[in-house]
Amino acid sequence: MDDKGGYRQINSAFNACAFDDILGSQMAQLPELPDVEQLTPRVLRILGQNPGKFTFQGTNTYVIGTGRQRLIIDTGGGEADWASLINDTLKARGITIARVLLTHWHGDHTGGVADLIRLYPDLEHHIYKNQPDRGQQNIYHAQTFDVEGATVRALHTPGHSEDHMCFILEEEGEPRAMFTGDTILGHGTSTMEDLSSFMDSLQNITDQQCEVGYSAHGAVIENLPLKMVQELRHKTRREAQVLTALASYASRGQRSLTTSELVAEIYGQSLNAETRAFALEPFIDQVLRKLAGDGKVGFEVRAGQRKWFIMDMMQGSIRPARSGSAREILVAA
């Protein structure tokens, strides 16, 4: 599998360059997906022909509906093979496209827009995205899009990106399904620009009670509620890990520590320097910023460096938490 999806456009809380070996190993374990697959009578999946360490088997394009006119969600990264594949597939099935919905601005989702307009000029004014580019139409929260056999409702889910939208497929008599974009992946977990918004979006997705997930990358998520529990647990565990480390540090009489020092406190000193600096530190910084917004941690600037501390320890309001008991130190601001 060629690494056509190996672009370096990545969110600030994660630098995948530091995880090339790990990502390469994960790719080898991914299930193979067909280029074109009719997942249900209403959902056709076409691979973006851009497989890679960050795009997995490639970006999924979804063709939605049962009639001649249908919706498309996401357009791949602009690969010529994708343009040929989608053109041949739609022609063979007698399908035309009414509207194109983009989950967010990242290039592996929007790169094929120009090819679609070249192939189908009538689509020029029917490209929809939250925070639209010039010539595109806006997608707003709870907006609905209808074609024969399918009604899709937009759900604003910022975090992975500020403009990120998921889409709920609402059809009577079928399990509720959601197109989850890059917020929830078919394999592994996603990256984010803002962890606080991302966590809110995870809860929002959970509240929709959809059973099936169609991600922008990877296989169908057959049990979306279970996947949501796992995602929320994973992020919450990271918060507890940070709080426990800060509490332990304070209990030893230390005042505060930098993000770099906190990463060493959590993961030890033997980490690869590149992994620590370009992957773990940006992510832990996102966790700290969320916890600061929640009133659970604070920081001071000393010698030009931001140094973090746990609020309760600095205020002397409770005893140090025992290892693994981070819940004892969670106090609202």
Swiss-Prot record:
Primary gene name: claF
Q: Which CDD domains match?
A: LACTB2-like_MBL-fold
The main enzyme category here is: hydrolase
Q: What induces it?
A: Expression is down-regulated during biotrophic growth within tomato leaves. The expression is induced at later stages of infection when conidiophores emerge from the plant and produce conidia.
Q: Which cofactors does the annotated protein need, by name?
A: Zn(2+)
Which Gene Ontology MF annotations are present? hydrolase activity; metal ion binding
This chain's protein is named Atrochrysone carboxyl ACP thioesterase
Record EC number? 3.1.2.-
How, per the record, is the cofactor bound?
A: Binds 2 Zn(2+) ions per subunit.
Residues annotated to bind Zn(2+) 1: H104, H106
Q: Where does Zn(2+) 2 bind?
A: D108, H109
The record describes the protein's role as: Atrochrysone carboxyl ACP thioesterase; part of the gene cluster that mediates the biosynthesis of the bianthraquinone cladofulvin, a conidial pigment not required for virulence but that plays a role in fitness and resistance to environmental stresses including UV light and low-temperature stress. The pathway begins with the synthesis of atrochrysone thioester by the polyketide synthase (PKS) claG. The atrochrysone carboxyl ACP thioesterase claF then breaks the thioester bond and releases the atrochrysone carboxylic acid from claG.
List the SUPFAM superfamilies.
Metallo-hydrolase/oxidoreductase
Q: In which pathway is this protein known to take part?
A: Pigment biosynthesis
SMART domains associated with the record: Lactamase_B (SM00849)
The chemistry this enzyme catalyses reads: atrochrysone carboxyl-[ACP] + H2O = atrochrysone carboxylate + holo-[ACP] + H(+)
- Entries under Gene3D superfamilies matching the protein: Ribonuclease Z/Hydroxyacylglutathione hydrolase-like (3.60.15.10), Winged helix-like DNA-binding domain superfamily/Winged helix DNA-binding domain (1.10.10.10)
